[in-house]
Amino acid sequence: MKLHAIEAGNFKLDGGAMFGVVPKVLWNKTNPADANNQIDLAARCLLIEDGNRLILIDTGMGNKQSDKFFGFYNMWGNFDLEQSLKQKGFHKDDITDVFLTHLHFDHCGGAVSWNNSHTGYETTFKNATYWSNENHWHWATEPNAREKASFLSENILPIQESGQLKFIETSNNPLINHSELNFGVLFVDGHTEKQMIPHIKYQDKTIVFCADLLPTAGHIPLPYVMGYDTRPLLTLPEKDRFLKQAAANNFYLFLEHDAHNHIITVKETEKGIRLNQVFSVNDIL
């Protein structure tokens, strides 16, 4: 097995929205805001080479939205999903599986592209099976008013219409040790219904793709919960259990949205779970 970090683009969001009720004087220490109160964020995907499979976890925002749409998120840097794949020696048609942690636009936008004539949409990865789960799919296709702006039909429905969609089986246990893609999956409901957190056994390590359970290293303290979470009081125990397990088992936490800290470990302290070590992707993958 080989793992590759795939940078799909950098963007910015309001720091207050990213940290909920936590005062700016606190979160600004780890995630400094610009003059517009926005903080730097990444869309860092993970590519898994495993035998004959080439599995892409999440896809970033993609490039099919309008300039006005992207203007809201102040895109920065030169990263692009397809270009990042090429830099690793791959083409989009090589991808066999696309695993979507959830269907918010910054995680699944790159899964669907314009067709050649710009008259409609098509899946970006023609030879891939797309993986979601049934609970989350229904949640996203019949969205609540709060999340509706994050679940864009053009990112979601073409996947189903293509016939490439499959669902990861859920169970009564929130952690599946061995999914259809040969890695573990933790299901969490605080951010959105049945977000999926991959746990990948790699050499002698466990790599956890944290998605929006832990978007940045600045979100490690327990009360530091995003304002975007639909059930913040559920995020708290989910995050507490996860971080304690991560500290006890020395998990390597792959941060999808942290523009500056790629992979981290955490440790127990008198103040709770805190940052332990920071690694670049080249140190670990």
Indicate where each model-derived feature is located.
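Metallo-beta-lactamase
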Residues: 76-79, 84-90, 94-106, 122-187, ...
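Cap/insert and terminal regions of metallo-dependent hydrolase folds
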Residues: 72-83, 201-285
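Active-site metal-binding loops of divalent metal-dependent hydrolases
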Residues: 8-9, 59-62, 103, 135-136, ...
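Active-site beta-strand termini and strand-to-loop segments that position acidic
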Residues: 48-51, 199-203
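Metal-dependent catalytic neighborhoods of phosphoester/phosphodiester hydrolases
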Residues: 108-119, 265-266
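Zn-dependent metallo-beta-lactamase
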Residues: 1-56, 61-65, 69-72, 172, ...
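Residue-level marker for buried hydrophobic side chains located in beta-strands
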Residues: 55-57, 99, 130, 207-209
